[in-house]
Amino acid sequence: MGRIKENQSKKKTLLRDSKAYSDQAAAAVTSSDDGFDEPKEITAPKRKLPCGNSDAKKKKFKHPEANVKPPTLEEIKEIRDTRNLFHSNLFKLQVKEMLEELQLKPKYSNYIENWLETFTTAVHEFQDGLLDNCQLEVPLHLHKKLFNFQFLTPTAEPKLIGAAAIGTLLGPKLVVDVALEMPEKCFQKEDYRNLIFDQKRALYLATVASKLKELPACAADHFAYNYHANNPLKPVLELTPTGKIGKHLSLRLYITAPKAIFKLSRFVPWNNNVRPSFFGDKWDESETLPSTQHYNANVLFDLTLAENQKLLLSTFSGHRNFQEGLLLLKVWLRQRQLDVGFSGFSAHILAAYIVYLKQNRLLHQSSSSYQVARTVWNQLANSDWTQGITLCPQQPHQLSTLAGYYDVCFMDVTGYYNICANLPLSVYKAVCAEAKLAVELLNDVRVNSFSQIFMQASPLYTRMDNILKITNPATVDQLLELHVQPQVKYDYANYAHPQLLKLLTDLLQKGLGKRVHAILPLETASKSWTVDTKAPIIGRSLTLGLILDPEHAFEVLDKGPATNEDAEGAAEFRKFWGEKSNLRRFQDGSITEAVVWAAVTDAPSKKRLIVRQIVLHLLEQHLQLEQSDVHYIAGELDIIYSLTSSFKVAKLQTKLKLEQETDAEAVTPLVIHCYDALARQLHTLGDLPLDIVSISGISPVFRYCEPQPLLPQARLVADRMHAGHVLRVIIQLGPSGKWPNELGALRSLKTAFLIQIGKQLKEQQHLHTQLCKEGLLVLKQGYCFLLELAHTKEVALLKQQQTERGVTAYVDNAASREIERRHYILPRVSGALHALHQSHSTFGPTVLIAKRWLATQMIDDGLWPSIATELLVAHLFQQRQMPHTTVAPQTGFIRFLQLLAHSDWASELFLLNFNNSWTEQQITDLEHSYRSERDSYPALCLATAYDQQHAGRLWTTDDCPSKPVLGRVTLLARHALQLIESSLLSPSLGFVRPAQLFIASGEGYDLVIELKPDLLPNTLCYDLGSPFLPFSQRNFRLPLAGIDQLAKIVQQLRSAYSEYAAFFYNPHGGKELAIVWRPASEFAPKPFKVNELQACTPCSVGKVQVVRDTLVEDFKLLLKDFYLRICTPEQLKREQRSHNKPKRYFDDQSEPDVDKPQKKKKKKGTVTKPTDLKKRLKKSKSLSALC
């Protein structure tokens, strides 16, 4: 961790680092460091105005309306579109600005034109020759049939295709696609069969690459091969120019073929063009050869490319509105990563769909770019391509027939090529769901949806609740050889990825049924390789993401058909589920086959693993895969808030049913039930002067947000109450006009009420109570509650001030805001968060993981308020950035890290409109106030619908969290995301180990103060350890109720020495305090000033200086009995490397204390065996540190 800077320039740098990387879409086209010389600005000379004609000036401004030009037709149309199409002018301006940034600069277009001219000239100079002259590897990893191949010079000129041709190139790195057509004489009549066509394409590409490398103009360029859309039958040549321009632009060369070489009818879906003999398989001649519809579409892609490109050019060329509309759609699609890989929904499909809508008169030639994008989303959301759509005016074959061979059917202009041949139905439905969400966001006038639609990047893995990875080569071979049908192998030309995808998705979809919304492949783009190396084998692994249905995913029972009603169905059910299926009788009297996965009373964390249990069973039952053969990622981080095994639940004296393997989420209902019982008992108290109107719990546990497992272990020790956690409860009494008008008297009366409540609880309910400074402590069933009384008059008295003229004024201040927040606003927010957890059961566990992560990174409540974490997670669950709300806390935590890593803290206001209590006007006013008065709001701005006039300033302050802390958390979140993403997308790794995420880095700290372990209780959560110290002896001693002495001391250190040092510690059982010194300028000598002498020492005549060693002594004094020793992180590392344990506090040899009575000496003559002095724990002499 870098030093925390105080100066404003460093703070601005941290804020700049926290901006979302979704701006990369425009990074390339707006960069100035791109290898080109920027044109110099030419300033026009200013025209001198005559200064003596004052009458002319008067006449000029006498009738200003006479000099105003009337609006043009374009301006009138723009105003009308703004009113009719956009729900806010801000959204329109944001779209307009983004489109301006995405425009291709002339220098790039000029470079592309010049390169194409040079390449065309070079192609015409190519000489015919045999393949023997090619010195490069052929980019095709197949067993090739031996045939002679002669390179012939292309007869057609190279052409731009794709985005470069229709003017929709998109950064951050521009990829220009160029097509080079092979001569017709290169092919023979039978080349359409058995992959000969693909092999000739690859040979031709290798020859072209070899000839290009020999050209002086291309000698310095970087040559590499890659696969188009992860298709091993579609190698392309990637050329990256030398110099800085290569960072922003690259070119891809496609080899295509003329349409006339084969009849397109040879490639209809029901024809076979890959014979079984090609793979050495035998086939019964009496049987019909299996269809190879996907391989046929692969060949048709090349044969129909020119004609499809011509259709796209007719629609997009010269029509800026369609080009900009497609750019908007491409940004939207790329941010969701649904366009990646063999199974991706490519931008080419979007372009073709715009043409289809125009043909069907759903888009007009004069439609604006926004209308184009909105119409596409609206039509996609309500579309059904499974029945087939077509661009061909006269379709040669019926769509219903063609659609039967594909998941999704979208025929091209020829009527033979299915543009969506490789698109799985699940990916198509996911795109439709995203389009529907985009339309809903655009229709919601209460939010500015621009950021959610275009700017916020949401990688596909952040949408998955569970992930299945099959990466073992032996496992893949087993699946391909034993379980994949031969016709599937021929159809995909033995490409492993689509075969595995079809095999697994069909099985899992049948087994999971309504438990899942979707099963999507998670792909990464293939990496390029140099032209002198062999083509890599890709697709030998599979990663599937499961989006679960919260209503059905955690059902404990799968019920089959009744045996007496459907014997065949029952037999099939038994066969499918195997030994898991049993005949069961239900309460309604029915007797059916059923599979039970868990008990109804199981903890929520166990029920969330039901889908994992089902998937692993299906893989073992049908595919003979053991659990060790696959990586199933689900619930790996649940251990973070589970109960540590060091604490034995059996030792608790309680009547509650507790298991040793429990967690914070599972024990929370027990706490809430106890609270509800206490609330009922309080309502039954009859002898109070005023009735109790409402009782509200405000501690995090009442909203399922307490990461520490709260066990019933609070107790009385010598008439003093000891508890690890105190549960705060706010009580509001009925109205009365007899409350005093003086603050001290009112609080005294409140104390009297609490005494009366405690007395009646003891007499009527037999509960132990104890009065303290903050309220009334009540012990019930092993839990300690702190009761506070709330009265609106107290807030008014705190605001009351006397002016100089004796007039009473009511002014907000810190004390009044805190009372108003804790007594009136927090109960409502707590109730809203509790309701949010009831509707989204993942909210609570997500907060638990998030709080544990911040704590293990040594970010305590003094640096980052815990309520801020809860509200940020609630914001994630409230905003509709994704079609489906996650049901996995692990995924919710990843989305929380995304929010921390890519939020622009300087400009983003987090609004939580609970129950839609805020009107549109209120939201608009708050956003306007936030933008116009940004400096008056804290660095992290959170606002709820219950904040009243304090919106945006109630839950955080300027110092908590500060801008440096926000920058630090942003960097930590980005690093954690890198670890998670690299493990999830790795072909060989499973999920990241919790220890990699939940142990802070020991780098960057200057000093570490080790604290006495027996005075600091350990956390009840699963402890992953410290970055500085080894595990110490466990200590689960309960402190006095409501006392956290270490937190108070750290607060004192920060308030006194924050100008010179920053303090960090883990509030969940940390045994050390890490210190970072401020910059050296803070410790430089400075002139003597009376008001600036804190922590200063005289250093020379008239000057003073802050000395670090003196500050360390002050730290020791404040820590008192907690201090054990101080050292640097480097010293701790050396100790751990040398395995020489230092003299620890609990290893000290105890010496006889003169105050204690000495044991009697044994008489002489007695023989005793010599015994070694055993090391034993030396307890603190001053246990008052716990009080």
Curated annotation (Swiss-Prot):
It comes from the Eukaryota. One of its GO terms (cellular component) is CURI complex. GO terms for molecular function: RNA binding. Keywords: Chromosome, Nucleus, RNA-binding. Residues 1-20 have a biased composition (Basic and acidic residues). InterPro entries: NOL6/Upt22, Nrap_D1, Nrap_D2, Nrap_D3, Nrap_D4, Nrap_D5, Nrap_D6. It holds the Pfam family Nrap_D5. This is Nucleolar protein 6. It comes from Drosophila mojavensis (Fruit fly).
